[in-house]
Amino acid sequence: MALALSDVKRIAHLARIETSDAEAEQTLAQLNNFFSLVEQMQAVDTTGIEPLAHPLSAVRDIAQRLREDAVTESDRRADYQRPAPATENGLYLVPKVIE
């Protein structure tokens, strides 16, 4: 899949990004290189290959030392709701604005 310069300019327009012609051409080259890489990766036959949870272990016989999942923040809902004018069951109460 290759993009044309008009595609890049249209995408920039839709994203409300102002680009010069030089920037658009540079972006076009980068995007086409990226799409070329994706096409190369999609062409590789990966049948029979198991996905790796930790790819580093496939290169070296090591295990990654991952930290334990631990709660680092306490529940401060009450502290945050204390200055609110009105709360109920942990929710902020606001005036009705749509009838």
Curated annotation (Swiss-Prot):
Pfam families named among the record's database cross-references: GatC
A GO molecular-function descriptor: ATP binding
Keyword Aminoacyl-tRNA synthetase applies: no
InterPro entries: Asp/Glu-ADT_sf_sub_c (IPR036113), GatC (IPR003837)
Recorded catalytic activity of this chain's protein: L-glutamyl-tRNA(Gln) + L-glutamine + ATP + H2O = L-glutaminyl-tRNA(Gln) + L-glutamate + ADP + phosphate + H(+); L-aspartyl-tRNA(Asn) + L-glutamine + ATP + H2O = L-asparaginyl-tRNA(Asn) + L-glutamate + ADP + phosphate + 2 H(+)
A single BP term in Gene Ontology: glutaminyl-tRNAGln biosynthesis via transamidation
EC number assigned by the record: 6.3.5.-
Protein name from the UniProt record: Aspartyl/glutamyl-tRNA(Asn/Gln) amidotransferase subunit C
Gene: gatC
